[in-house]
Amino acid sequence: MNAFTRAWYALERHYQDTRHVLLRDRFACEPDRFERMHERLDGMLFDYSKNRLGEDTLQLLCNLADAADLEGKMRALRTGAKVNGSEGRAALHTALRLPDGADAVYVDGRDVLPEIRRELNRALKFAHSLDDGSYQGITGKRITDFVHIGIGGSDLGPAMCVQALEPFRRHITVHFAANADPACLDAVLCRLNPETTVFCVASKSFKTPETLLNAQAVKAWYRGAGFSESETACHFCAVSADTAAAAAFGIAAERVFAMYDWVGGRYSVWSPVGLPVMVAVGGARFRELLAGAHAMDRHFFSTPTRHNIPVLMALIAVWYNNFQHADGQTAVPYSHNLRLLPAWLNQLDMESLGKSRASDGSPAVCKTGGIVFGGEGVNCQHAYFQLLHQGTRLIPCDFIVPMTAQGREDGRSRFTVANAFAQAEALMKGKTLDEARAELADLPEAERERLAPHKEFPGNRPSNSILIDRLTPYNLGMLMAAYEHKTFVQGAIWNVNPFDQWGVEYGKQLAKTIIGELEGGTSVHDASTEGLMAFYRECRLKGGGAA
């Protein structure tokens, strides 16, 4: 039996030995529990004391990390080793946020920092030229709107950041169009003036069908407004690893910004893919975002496991996923401007870790990935929190809470924070049947006994609380980097590659075939797919569908 298997079995035995220990009892017996089980970094506090674990659990989880060679895998990530084995690539998103003066970072023997600096500065310069009005549309009018056309990692990260940093917005309004459904882009275009709008096409391969369909639709919009091809080109920029393909589309080289094949899409907001963030909040604020992420990088790569925030987040997630058989994980930002964070986390975690094969291609030997979902607090308290409190499923929760409001402070911010703290406490403590009866003491006994079971809460429902003093670019960068590194650590423990996404590609492959068959002709599919295609054709004949 190897060290990893021994560490795994030790955790399985430990779970059986401690499964009946209640969190409320742990807090009653451990008055210093919070002091021992929270970490701070700059303006962030990570409280993990409301989890079903003790110091012995943490030690066993740290043993598992050691047995998985987490330290070696972290070093490989940091130094540009090809940690994305299936695609033979490094994963150097951390290099994108290195400050000036950092040591060289090599990919295939080449220092990539000069290229990173050059492309970042080019993107920042272009964003500034839009902001100060020095770059204008073909008719000489100042640019007022910027539309980012991308999908997946080229959309979710930038869109979330722009939304989160709305209070820092400068002059230009930034829009996003991801879905190929015509209603998505049409809803944006109907509000815009083609003379005062710039469009950014973001696609690593410059072959993403949804993105190119929307980009072609924008070209048609310009033609309909009387613009020539060359005039239209002045209103386009691009971010891609295939700069030649962007040029072939008609975008001038000086407005094509490079992505890198050693950065995955869902980790790319730190690159020129973050151009809409630069446009929205300005170069100085974007650099603050990078600085916050780098602060978390330094913490991650230099802090011992027992006090390492992303590592603790990941080990706790492994504890629930693999040993307590949790049914999912929810993330709840108590901030209206962070309402897109759960969608970003959904992709980051599930696309990275939804793998049934180990890094070497053999079958995964344990349950990997997990269902990650979330919503905006306080709203989701009136939606799915009922299941968290009294349902039969175990779903750990991350509460993400800024301490200071971004909007007008009139008591509503305090109400929001109080609700976050109250929900975490209620999930942990629960309410016993006797406590429920005591609350109903004024009722007749029969009515009290009838209602009390419905007001009982099992409690012992775990959560992390991630607090930030304010929602700033720096703190947002720290928060995002913490979750990126959490995802990497989970992949390291499970021995899966968090940087590929082959499952996404297969559906795209089939869609290429089906799209040509929807209008008729020969097709060979299963009976269900054939039936769906037949119904589409029927609706089209009746005039019930659009191209």
UniProtKB/Swiss-Prot annotation:
Keywords: Cytoplasm, Gluconeogenesis, Glycolysis, Isomerase. GO terms for molecular function: carbohydrate derivative binding; glucose-6-phosphate isomerase activity; monosaccharide binding. The keyword Isomerase applies. Its EC number is 5.3.1.9. CDD domains: SIS_PGI_1, SIS_PGI_2. It holds the Pfam family PGI. It catalyses: alpha-D-glucose 6-phosphate = beta-D-fructose 6-phosphate. The active site is at E351, H382, K508. This is Glucose-6-phosphate isomerase 2. Pathway: Carbohydrate biosynthesis; gluconeogenesis; Carbohydrate degradation; glycolysis; D-glyceraldehyde 3-phosphate and glycerone phosphate from D-glucose: step 2/4. GO terms for cellular component: cytosol. SUPFAM superfamilies: SIS domain. NCBIfam families: PRK00179.1 (NF001211). InterPro entries: G6P_Isomerase, G6P_Isomerase_C, Phosphoglucose_isomerase_CS, SIS_dom_sf, SIS_PGI_1, SIS_PGI_2. Belongs to the GPI family.
